From Swiss-Prot:
<feature type="compositionally biased region" description="Basic residues">
    <location>
        <begin position="408"/>
        <end position="420"/>
    </location>
</feature>
<feature type="region of interest" description="Disordered">
    <location>
        <begin position="353"/>
        <end position="420"/>
    </location>
</feature>
<protein>
    <recommendedName>
        <fullName>Nuclear pore complex-interacting protein family member B8</fullName>
    </recommendedName>
</protein>
<dbReference type="InterPro" id="IPR054697">
    <property type="entry name" value="NPIP_N"/>
</dbReference>
<comment type="similarity">
    <text>Belongs to the NPIP family.</text>
</comment>
<dbReference type="InterPro" id="IPR009443">
    <property type="entry name" value="NPIP"/>
</dbReference>
<dbReference type="Pfam" id="PF06409">
    <property type="entry name" value="NPIP"/>
</dbReference>
<feature type="region of interest" description="Disordered">
    <location>
        <begin position="260"/>
        <end position="280"/>
    </location>
</feature>
<feature type="compositionally biased region" description="Basic and acidic residues">
    <location>
        <begin position="374"/>
        <end position="402"/>
    </location>
</feature>
<feature type="compositionally biased region" description="Polar residues">
    <location>
        <begin position="270"/>
        <end position="280"/>
    </location>
</feature>
Length: 432
């Protein structure tokens, strides 16, 4: 582009004919011009001679004759045409390069329009129909969801990279899935089965869920409901050598348990076996009505629900006691005891018995030394009440003239007054 602008300058046109044709041919080869008219114009410039720098002063009558210059008007027209065409061509080149640069910069820098984590963009992307979702589909970096590229939602370089990684992982997963399916199919061909990787995964998941459910139900059963009486009943059956109808053989289990507790079983009636049996409450009511098959070991030929005859007891000492209970026994004389004398003495009033000496007596009676000290002490003066003490008569009111005639009292010292007052008080207390 720069060399073409130099060609059209008047200094360049004033060169020699051979040098001008060589340089023009080189530029024509280097520039890929879409129009053939431009080549013809440039080749026709080599025919003209430029003797002076101002595009030639002479006038050319015949264009085919040598030694004459063309008219400046035609030369100016040719130069204007070349410059105008090159300007259009340069504008197209600049426009294309600017578009390419802008698109390249858009792919390099991050787009902050649709991938900033805003909820409205995500909702529009997910609520839009599939017919609108045209173009690339990328995974949002913030929400890890697929977002389609619509107007206002640009895809940056980071999203393109994530999309490519997602495609690569998907392809790897497909390849691995094929390998797994071939392995499973080869393994299952021996057993006559054919499973895909998806079915195998579902089967393993179902097994895991089944195991979890079993463990959960096992943990839900309380320890009181984990068959605590079954072992006891089996032990009772082992003693009786009977194991056929264990949970429903009422009287047998009750008898065994009561023998363990040291009690004699009651007569085996139907009502009694249902109400008093401790294990019958835990057996279902349907089991009580169904008769059980007899066993050889027990030698029981009748149904357990039918009342059995009472077995005769062996003769014992209690038989004589039962016969004696009907005859009233004579009162047996009691042996003489100390209580008989006590009953006779109860009618006579007893003298008051002296109390035994205790520690409190010493506290109540002071020792001799304290008694003697109390005797030696002089008796304390008796305190008189306010009513018993003779009240001194109130002084009579005297007139001023009589009061002035009386002699004035002598002034006494404070110490004498205090001693005199104390002696008078003690005299009143001692000699009332």
């Amino acid at each position: 582009m720069v060399k073409l602008s130099i060609v059209l300058t008047p200094q360049f046109l004033s060169h020699d004919q051979g040098q001008l044709t060589k340089e023009l041919q080189q530029h024509v080869k280097s520039v890929t011009c879409p129009c053939e008219y431009l080549r013809k114009v440039i080749n026709s410039l080599a025919v003209y001679r430029h003797r002076e720098t101002d595009f030639g002063v002479g006038v050319r009558d015949h264009p085919g004759q040598h030694g004459k210059t063309p008219s400046p008007q035609k030369l100016d027209n040719l130069i204007i045409i070349i410059i105008g065409f090159l300007r259009c061509y340069t504008f197209n080149i600049l426009f294309c390069t600017s578009c390419l640069c802008v698109s390249f910069l858009k792919t390099i820098f991050w787009s902050r329009n649709g991938h900033d984590g805003s909820m409205d963009v995500q909702q529009r992307a997910w609520r839009s129909n599939r017919s609108r979702q045209k173009g690339l589909r990328s995974i949002c970096m913030h929400t890890k969801k697929r977002v389609s590229s619509f107007r206002g939602n640009k895809i940056g370089l980071k999203d393109v990279i994530t999309l490519r990684r997602h495609v690569e992982t998907k392809v790897r997963a497909k390849i691995r899935k094929r390998k797994v399916t071939t392995k499973i199919n080869r393994h299952d061909k021996i057993n006559g089965k054919r499973k895909t990787a998806r079915k195998q995964k579902m089967f393993q998941r179902a097994q895991e869920l089944r195991r979890r459910a079993e463990d959960y139900h096992k943990c839900k059963i309380p320890p009181s409901a984990r068959k605590p009486l079954c072992n006891w009943v089996r032990m009772a059956a082992a003693e009786h050598r009977h194991s056929s109808g264990l949970p429903y053989w009422l009287y047998l289990t009750a008898e065994t348990l009561k023998n363990r507790m040291g009690r004699q079983p009651p007569p085996p009636t139907q009502q009694h076996s249902i109400t008093d049996n401790s294990l019958s409450l835990k057996t279902p009511p349907e089991c009580l009505l169904t008769p059980l098959p007899p066993s050889v070991d027990d030698n029981i030929k009748e149904c357990p629900l039918a009342p059995l005859p009472p077995s005769p007891l062996p003769p014992s000492v209690d038989d004589n006691l039962k016969e004696c209970l009907f005859v009233p026994l004579p009162p047996s004389p009691l042996p003489p005891s100390v209580d008989d004398n006590l009953k006779e003495c109860l009618f006579v009033p007893l003298p008051p018995s002296p109390l035994p000496p205790s520690v409190d007596d010493n506290l109540k009676t002071p020792p001799l030394a304290t008694q003697e000290a109390e005797v030696e002490k002089p008796p304390k003066p008796k305190r008189w009440r306010v009513d018993e003490v003779e009240q001194s008569p109130k002084p009579k009111r005297q007139r001023e003239a009589e009061a002035q005639q009386l002699p004035k009292p002598k002034r006494r010292r404070l110490s004498k007054l205090r001693t005199r007052h104390c002696t008078q008080a003690w005299a009143i207390r001692i000699n009332p």
